[in-house]
């Protein structure tokens, strides 16, 4: 029964792992729902800022902030949003593939890049593969704050304002639904025309304090910060959804493996019993 003992031990080990993956799946479901709530709560804020920026830009057409002006691209910047932990399927790998595809398009034009990295997995990726990382932040926790991101985002915004980079992209995962998370490379700067114009019909002519141009300068920075924050929150929802699916698959696979091993165990046990009976019968016949 030595073979049967080993199989029984494997079954016990897999059952133990199955309990862990099942528990992790349930935790991921709970965390995903909380992240979805934060994601939904942040959208109206970013949308309202975009509308105010559009109104200010329309009211002051002669003023063009550097964040709104196209220029020749000599160097680009990427804000890359990744997870802090693994066990979330191909979430980060697919994101890196999208990043590398965009990066290749620019490098084919002899344009190099700087990176601002959010998340431990992103930091590990650039340590292994190289890249000029100018800012990095990780371990934001389950409830990130926009204040945690301001310092890192300021580094790349200053680089853009000073002309050290000429275009800024945000690379993150978009939450399509529980089963689908899609990596996306979104241009942050210069602002696309739709972002800069906002909603232009049926607006009152407001009086702004302080000066409208000063307010526009501050809001543009705040808008970019809110976009990055929203992406971090959305990426967190994507991470938990991907982990939930990965843990469910692991739990199901463990169940299938237990069934297969149970069948092998039963066959081994039956073979051992048959052998013992044969030995007893053989011994009796010899007597």
UniProtKB/Swiss-Prot annotation:
<comment type="subunit">
    <text>F-type ATPases have 2 components, CF(1) - the catalytic core - and CF(0) - the membrane proton channel. CF(1) has five subunits: alpha(3), beta(3), gamma(1), delta(1), epsilon(1). CF(0) has three main subunits: a, b and c.</text>
</comment>
<dbReference type="Pfam" id="PF00231">
    <property type="entry name" value="ATP-synt"/>
</dbReference>
<dbReference type="GO" id="GO:0042777">
    <property type="term" value="P:proton motive force-driven plasma membrane ATP synthesis"/>
</dbReference>
<keyword id="KW-0406">Ion transport</keyword>
<keyword id="KW-0997">Cell inner membrane</keyword>
<keyword id="KW-0813">Transport</keyword>
<dbReference type="GO" id="GO:0005886">
    <property type="term" value="C:plasma membrane"/>
</dbReference>
<dbReference type="InterPro" id="IPR023632">
    <property type="entry name" value="ATP_synth_F1_gsu_CS"/>
</dbReference>
<dbReference type="GO" id="GO:0045259">
    <property type="term" value="C:proton-transporting ATP synthase complex"/>
</dbReference>
<dbReference type="InterPro" id="IPR035968">
    <property type="entry name" value="ATP_synth_F1_ATPase_gsu"/>
</dbReference>
<dbReference type="GO" id="GO:0046933">
    <property type="term" value="F:proton-transporting ATP synthase activity, rotational mechanism"/>
</dbReference>
<comment type="similarity">
    <text>Belongs to the ATPase gamma chain family.</text>
</comment>
<comment type="function">
    <text>Produces ATP from ADP in the presence of a proton gradient across the membrane. The gamma chain is believed to be important in regulating ATPase activity and the flow of protons through the CF(0) complex.</text>
</comment>
<keyword id="KW-0139">CF(1)</keyword>
<keyword id="KW-0472">Membrane</keyword>
<keyword id="KW-0066">ATP synthesis</keyword>
<keyword id="KW-1003">Cell membrane</keyword>
<dbReference type="GO" id="GO:0005524">
    <property type="term" value="F:ATP binding"/>
</dbReference>
<keyword id="KW-0375">Hydrogen ion transport</keyword>
<protein>
    <recommendedName>
        <fullName>ATP synthase gamma chain</fullName>
    </recommendedName>
</protein>
<dbReference type="InterPro" id="IPR000131">
    <property type="entry name" value="ATP_synth_F1_gsu"/>
</dbReference>
């Amino acid at each position: 029964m030595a073979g049967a003992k080993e199989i029984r031990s494997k079954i016990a080990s897999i059952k133990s792992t199955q309990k862990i993956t099942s528990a992790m799946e349930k935790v991921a479901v709970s965390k995903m729902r909380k992240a979805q709530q934060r994601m939904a709560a942040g959208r109206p804020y970013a949308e309202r800022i975009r509308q105010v920026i559009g109104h200010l830009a329309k009211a002051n057409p002669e003023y063009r902030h550097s964040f709104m002006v196209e220029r020749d691209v000599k160097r680009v910047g990427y804000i890359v949003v990744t997870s802090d932990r693994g066990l979330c399927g191909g979430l980060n790998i697919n994101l890196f593939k999208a990043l590398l595809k965009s990066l290749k398009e620019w490098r084919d034009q002899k344009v190099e890049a700087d990176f601002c990295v959010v998340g431990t997995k992103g930091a590990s990726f650039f340590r292994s593969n190289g890249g000029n990382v100018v800012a990095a932040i990780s371990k934001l926790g389950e409830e990130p704050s926009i204040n945690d991101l301001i310092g890192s985002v300021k580094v790349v915004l200053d680089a853009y304002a000073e002309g050290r980079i000429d275009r800024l992209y945000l690379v993150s995962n978009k939450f399509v639904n529980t089963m689908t998370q899609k990596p996306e490379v979104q241009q942050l700067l210069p602002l696309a025309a739709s972002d800069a114009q906002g909603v232009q019909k049926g607006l009152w002519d407001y009086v702004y304090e302080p000066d409208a141009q000063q307010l526009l300068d501050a809001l543009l920075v705040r808008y970019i910060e809110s976009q990055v924050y929203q992406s971090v929150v959305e990426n967190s929802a994507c991470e938990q959804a991907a982990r939930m699916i990965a843990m469910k698959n692991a739990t199901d696979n463990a169940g299938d493996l237990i069934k297969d091993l149970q069948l092998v165990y039963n066959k081994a046990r039956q073979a051992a019993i048959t052998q013992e009976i044969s030995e007893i019968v053989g011994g009796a016949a010899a007597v």
